[in-house]
């Protein structure tokens, strides 16, 4: 009798390559898939396959992104690589590809360049928690002292943006040599070393189900004799019958109790991350809950009106504005399930923001929204998306 295939279920981690144009991000991505496939199975992808990144849409924005996957000794990785700088900016701000860690590719021949800095800043702003560095093109540098200088420069740059520069793993190698099958330290060995660094330096991400319960409110119904039912998709955590719940955002926070969980018209004892459920709330009136609020574990999330954000403004070609905007611009900010009007303050010295720009701004909303750092939103004018953003820091 034939043995069935043994499938080991490895923990899953999301990563991606970032860094300056032409420093070798796509070549490195190809090298990783090629070399790890030989060792752990999977599918190798060539440079051309990765480079012809398909278009996808996130929050009304078109982004070109390549997705590859590979396995290491301990894990399964999903890895994103983008063809152009603008795609990285859009990807990181919309959270289209959430990264548990990033591989920063820096050419040893050139050292850190403007986009190196910009991608590190973006990673900090959008909450990419870990960066590992691959110093590429080491075959083009004969001078060991030069390599050391570039390494010091990279560590300093990381520290400037609050990453632990001194403790960051920096792997020196040549993605091209590795792709060509070079067996030296800078060839295949460097890729395997990078894989080990991914496994050991990036901790296993918390699964959505293990976090504190939160569910954005999509709809509210009143069922005679039963009370108020709130429907939505559980974003994080678990809700059980009998749990205390807070209703947060738009109005003063209210405490209530979950007296029932329904899914597909069946009663359950709990709902968990990813489930579309109806939650029955004890003693809550229909008019006390509305779309745009969240149900959450008490004390786990607070409502805020003022925050700093990293935003990307759609270009005219992407269907965005045709003209720049200025300080005091008042669009709608679409958080989870609803729009809230807010005004934008620009950084000192910035007069206006052009379509196609990305920039750090401060936002003041007219009504509070339940938020944490890292929450994504769309910027809209009359229902049309004109930008995307991510909460960098909550102020009040």
From Swiss-Prot:
State the EC number(s). Answer: 3.6.5.3
Region feature (G1): 19-26
- Binding-site positions, GTP: 19-26, 81-85, 136-139
Tell me where the signal peptide lies: none
What name does this protein carry? Elongation factor Tu
Annotated spans, G5: 174-176
Q: Which GO terms describe its molecular function?
A: GTP binding; GTPase activity; guanosine tetraphosphate binding; translation elongation factor activity
Mostly located where?
cytoplasm
- Say what the protein does: GTP hydrolase that promotes the GTP-dependent binding of aminoacyl-tRNA to the A-site of ribosomes during protein biosynthesis.
- Source organism of this protein record: Nitrosomonas europaea (strain ATCC 19718 / CIP 103999 / KCTC 2705 / NBRC 14298)
Q: Which reaction does it catalyse?
A: GTP + H2O = GDP + phosphate + H(+)
Quaternary arrangement and interactors, per the entry? Monomer.
